[in-house]
Amino acid sequence: MIRDTATNTTQTQAAPQQAPAQQFTQAPQEKPMQSTQSQPTPSYAGTGGINSQFTRSGNVQGGDARASEALTVFTRLKEQAVAQQDLADDFSILRFDRDQHQVGWSSLVIAKQISLNGQPVIAVRPLILPNNSIELPKRKTNIVNGMQTDVIESDIDVGTVFSAQYFNRLSTYVQNTLGKPGAKVVLAGPFPIPADLVLKDSELQLRNLLIKSVNACDDILALHSGERPFTIAGLKGQQGETLAAKVDIRTQPLHDTVGNPIRADIVVTTQRVRRNGQQENEFYETDVKLNQVAMFTNLERTPQAQAQTLFPNQQQVATPAPWVASVVITDVRNADGIQANTPEMYWFALSNAFRSTHGHAWARPFLPMTGVAKDMKDIGALGWMSALRNRIDTKAANFDDAQFGQLMLSQVQPNPVFQIDLNRMGETAQMDSLQLDAAGGPNAQKAAATIIRQINNLGGGGFERFFDHTTQPILERTGQVIDLGNWFDGDEKRDRRDLDNLAALNAAEGNENEFWGFYGAQLNPNLHPDLRNRQSRNYDRQYLGSTVTYTGKAERCTYNAKFIEALDRYLAEAGLQITMDNTSVLNSGQRFMGNSVIGNNMVSGQAQVHSAYAGTQGFNTQYQTGPSSFY
């Protein structure tokens, strides 16, 4: 059933008949005016209340036009997907109208229902429809600055629009429309369709989005119905087969379902390979690739401690390098041929991020690139904030691997931190929301316990032997909110996150005050978040140009190093043995490696890898389900 709430009719109904030919009739006689003095004065609750009292059919704002077009497009795409791609015709597409329900933006709702223990359960995935023709009121923040008060105006982003009130109204509407007023509504993760996406020209992307949205509903329904979880025991493969992790260093972004660019300097792909290197099917690789995780390496400046000598004859301790590498995870996904996205599959894919420590792959994006006039990743910019106080010419002909190694060793601490950008409105909204809850808040304990349960499902149990989540966090918030969006480098659409700390240092060209201004706009806790965001966007325009467009927000969180290392050891002991396909050691064999952990969240070693896949034993685990979400 595909229903338009503006007309309360389904798409399969016949088109209305044409209006009859115009006829001239005698004007009706005037009726005596009735007195209205005795009637109570109506109450108008905002614009919507006035429109309800004084009904007119036209809407000059045009806020409903994009939702109407989206419903038409998705209706056609559903027919195609059912006919051509074996998509089951057991879901509904509903139009949740902003004017009818008095919310910021309309959405299309992909809804699928089952009966669980006699109770109807409806999974919904709202596809939010930001609309450039609708000007939402800005959020105003008063900031006291000495004797004066500054007013900061902030744009409303899609995550703010999708509030608890929005979801509650959407849930009631879905229940009533599907005739299940007492049904339990579970969220399969909201996802915005970019305002600048031309719907009629993007049918391939939107058809994939429709199919993935139906699968997302299946994922959350399967979670509630007790589907047997994915386990690594099922990856033992056939004789002569192994799992390999391939590390690619890229300059081009990945893209999500609707074409948003995703920064992906490092991509670790897990795949099945034959030990002799031969494919079982020469031109068919659907069953080869399993998953991938994308990252980039940011550099964080650390406060420099003064070296101290407690006794006159004591040797002075060397000050640690001033920069810490942060490996930021930007994308976690299964191979296109895998329809399901379960929590266990997510943790399997994410665990491979730690493999970027093997051969110090996390540092490889900083290797000098020749022929690039304006290199945002030029590691030579670190020279501006060193004792040299000048850029190091990494493009020079005599700048070799040994010099690169010396530069890295002197300026960057050898053990990276692992971070992740979590987006409640993204492709992996369910897992991102779960981790944000675990990072702090009223659901922190439940969320952390749920994550541990999912990892136990993946490996067969016993993760608590490697990591005790009751005494330490899985991950922590940094207070850094990341603007998601894009910019154009010539004709190429790229991720706004290209502007990281090293890129800003390159752009500042030695102006240290300017760099610190940029850095403070990212995470200075002494500045109000709205003020930081305004300053950050000013730097975006200064460094990236006027083409910057914002599509949402993510929160950057830092993984506990003990959790990342424990996950690697746990999966290795459970039988997950992976070889590295194409890694190399930097600096002509020089070991770019630390001897101890520096800081609370820097990992202390490298991922475990194996020469062959030897896991043959199976594991059994009791799958657990919870109420409304993962809990």
UniProtKB/Swiss-Prot annotation:
Gene Ontology cellular component list: host cell cytoplasm
Domain of life: Viruses
Keyword Transcription: no
Disulfide links within the chain: none
Region (Homotetramerization): 590-611, 622-631
Protein name: Chimallin
Predominant localisation class: host cell
Region ranges (Disordered): 1-63
The protein's assembly and partners: Homotetramer. The tetrameric protomers further assemble as a square grid.
Biased composition (Polar residues): 32-59
Localisation: Host cytoplasm
Keyword line: Host cytoplasm
Family: Belongs to the Phikzvirus chimallin family.
Keyword Heme: no
Functional note: Self-assembles to form a proteinaceous shell that encloses the viral DNA and compartmentalizes proteins and DNA during viral infection. This micrometer-scale compartment contains narrow pores and is the site of viral replication, with the proteins involved in DNA replication localized inside. Provides a surface for docking of capsids during packaging. Probably protects the viral genome against host defenses.
Low complexity composition bias: residue spans: 1-29
Species of provenance: Pseudomonas phage 201phi2-1 (Pseudomonas chlororaphis phage 201phi2-1)
Induction: Expressed very early after infection. Encloses the DNA at 45 mpi.
